[in-house]
Amino acid sequence: MDNQGVIYSDLNLPPNPKRQQRKPKGNKNSILATEQEITYAELNLQKASQDFQGNDKTYHCKDLPSAPEKLIVGILGIICLILMASVVTIVVIPSTLIQRHNNSSLNTRTQKARHCGHCPEEWITYSNSCYYIGKERRTWEESLLACTSKNSSLLSIDNEEEMKFLSIISPSSWIGVFRNSSHHPWVTMNGLAFKHEIKDSDNAELNCAVLQVNRLKSAQCGSSIIYHCKHKL
């Protein structure tokens, strides 16, 4: 045995197919694990995105009114407009009509003071009568027509107190007293005899009466004298 030499040789055995397949097994498992992790991450991202979109829709839904709410709001708005228009119609139109009626009534009162118990504007009230104090000088007949156009008569004197009052207002004015001649009596516009004394009655040309400073006197009917009108209430 000592004489026999020990022979060392390298055995070149063919590779074992099973071992060759086992080596890549670890790599394959790691790849599969990585793929699973990626897939799981993608699923998580997708789920998170869906949750975010769902929450966003929820928030938007909370902020925006639904279709029935919009309809109700629109109906309420229309009702409010109708009510406002009705209020304006009820308040404005009657007030306008009332104002027109008042203006018409005022004109009627001014033209026909006897029917309402008040004197027209710019007239003076004294002892249940209205007096228009004229500033124009006219003849007796012109003064008579001017007072008639004002729904009144030429100034008449009922008593001494009224004469004093009128003398304070105006020193001189025509009165509604006349005569046909010096041989006829003095009469009023109603044809009644005038009882107060009239000065200068002897002059045949002076057939119309004038109030002058607390007394009555005769004057020519064609003279231009201030006139006053009287209207009994």
Curated annotation (Swiss-Prot):
SUPFAM superfamilies per record: C-type lectin-like
Induction pattern: Up-regulated in memory CD8-positive alpha-beta T cell clones upon antigen-specific stimulation.
Domain of life where this protein originates: Eukaryota
Extent of motif Immunoreceptor tyrosine-based inhibition motif (ITIM): 6-11, 38-43
Keywords linked to the UniProt accession: Adaptive immunity, Cell membrane, Disulfide bond, Glycoprotein, Host-virus interaction, Immunity, Innate immunity, Lectin, Membrane, Phosphoprotein, Receptor, Signal-anchor, Transmembrane, Transmembrane helix
GO terms for biological process, alphabetical: adaptive immune response; CD8-positive, gamma-delta intraepithelial T cell differentiation; cell surface receptor signaling pathway; innate immune response; natural killer cell inhibitory signaling pathway; negative regulation of natural killer cell mediated cytotoxicity; negative regulation of T cell mediated cytotoxicity; positive regulation of natural killer cell mediated cytotoxicity
Keyword Transferase carried by entry: no
Outcome recorded upon mutating residue 163 to I: Has no impact on the affinity for HLA-E
Residues linked to a glycan: 102-103, 151, 180
Modified residue annotations for Phosphotyrosine: 8, 40
Localisation: Cell membrane
Annotated C-type lectin domain residues: 118-231
One function term, GO molecular function aspect: MHC class I protein complex binding
Cytoplasmic side: 1-70
Recorded consequence of changing residue 217 to A: Reduces binding to HLA-E
Span list, region Disordered: 1-29
Primary site of residence: membrane
Ranges of the Extracellular topological domain: 94-233
Task of the protein: Immune inhibitory receptor involved in self-nonself discrimination. In complex with KLRD1 on cytotoxic and regulatory lymphocyte subsets, recognizes non-classical major histocompatibility (MHC) class Ib molecule HLA-E loaded with self-peptides derived from the signal sequence of classical MHC class Ia molecules. Enables cytotoxic cells to monitor the expression of MHC class I molecules in healthy cells and to tolerate self.
Protein name: NKG2-A/NKG2-B type II integral membrane protein
